[in-house]
Amino acid sequence: MPDLHIGGFQFVIHSVVPLFSSPPDRPSTAFSSPPAGAAADEMPVNVRLLPLRDATPPASRTLFESPVWSMTADGDMRRIEMRGRGCAEPYWVAQFQLPFRRVDVYFGPGQLTADGELMSPLSYPLDQLLLMYLLAEAGGMLMHAAGGVKTGGAVYAGPSGAGKTTLTRRLLAEGCEMFSDDRIIVRPWAGGLWLFGTPWPGDANVAANRCAPLARIHVLQKSGEDRDEPLAPAEALTKIIPCCSLPWFDPPVLEQSLQGLNRILQDVPHSILHFTKEAAQN
């Protein structure tokens, strides 16, 4: 498995066992090199893949717990554990120190193929959790949004059912270059604000490893007409927060994330995009 390049970060993989090669048609395969349009160096994040027997015990303070994954903390250390329902031992455990440039991921025997190759632990939810922490430090955000370039870089934010896939297909038909129809990264980079495609597509299956300067953020609203409605900064925050991947379970990092989002909204024009299925605009 080669390195992963997502949102201006290069996840440099170090493994003690051979890695399983993903099929070429998987979205993540396109993210094995820097994004097209990159205007600055990426920040390296070292990922060490180690056997589960070497993992440390859970930390003393629980931040989040569900039947599938949990996070504990001890000072600046964070520990994520992923396990299946009813499983005696975790699939994997990830541990990192804040602010982090390295994460140790400890894999269980169930993550190995019959040939002894390691299936990538850098998949949901670990990949997005790590990015939430990296982006909080960088002043950026992982958004539930479509995004791409027509007359400028634009983000189209909205929860499930808001019309991101519908709008993406329409914009593609109009010749717009789309980076994603479901998840977009917005962050300060190369002296400005940029949007990045991600390897997590929606129903339109758009997951392009591309980036571009950000010109505008739209909040999607299905309508019987097509118009762009200006959005006041205070209202924009309440509209866009539900479209953001935020570490609600980790208050200090959440505060960092919200400060970054507020700066983004101060620097980039934003509006409500009313649209119909028959037409779209940028």
Each language-model region and where it sits:
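Post-Walker A alpha-helix
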Residues: 167-168
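Conserved glycine(s) of the Walker
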Residues: 162-164
